[in-house]
Each structure stands twice: as structure tokens, then as C-alpha cells.
Swiss-Prot record:
Gene Ontology biological-process entries: regulation of DNA-templated transcription
Record's protein name: P fimbrial regulatory protein KS71A
Transcription regulation keyword on record: yes
InterPro entries in the record: FaeA (IPR006793), WH-like_DNA-bd_sf (IPR036388), WH_DNA-bd_sf (IPR036390)
Coiled-coil regions, chain positions: none
Pfam family, one: FaeA
Keywords, ordered alphabetically: Activator, Fimbrium biogenesis, Transcription, Transcription regulation
Gene name of the record: KS71A
Length: 77
């Protein structure tokens, strides 16, 4: 993967606290398929993670370790 594309995707996810595949593709001026390819490589490298896969739902990507939108904190005391 090109360092440029890797850095652009990571920067986008950092600035926007995540995003959908289509949003990332549009921001980087690439096709949805190209964006998905790079995102899957970053996921495999452990740098990003995605929302759980559900049929018919958009995939939401975010930096590894970031709290997913709508996820609550649970504490054990």
C-alpha cells in the first residue's frame, strides 16, 4: 500500500472520528472499491477497525482503539 494513501486515510479517520467507506472514497477521490481495499489492508495491519458487518448496512471505519459512535462505557467496580 502506498504510504500516501495510508496516511490520507488515517488522517481522515482521525479528523472525522471515523467514516463510511463511501465518505472516505469521496474525500480521497478514489472509488468505493479502492477505498475498501486500502481500509481492509489497514484493518489487517491492526490500524483501523470497522463496525460489525450487517447485511444492507454501511460499513463504518474508525481508528483502532477509538470508541465507536453510540457505544457506552462500562465500568466494573
Amino acid at each position: 500500500m502506498s504510504e500516501y494513501m495510508k496516511n490520507e486515510i488515517l488522517e481522515f479517520l482521525n479528523r472525522h472520528n471515523g467514516g463510511k467507506t463511501a465518505e472516505i472514497a469521496e474525500a480521497l477521490a478514489v472509488t468505493d472499491y479502492q477505498a475498501r481495499y486500502y481500509l481492509l489492508l489497514l484493518e489487517k495491519a491492526g490500524m483501523v477497525q470497522r463496525s460489525p458487518l450487517r447485511r444492507g448496512m454501511a460499513t463504518y471505519w474508525f481508528l483502532k482503539g477509538e470508541k465507536q459512535a453510540g457505544q457506552s462505557c462500562s465500568s466494573t467496580t
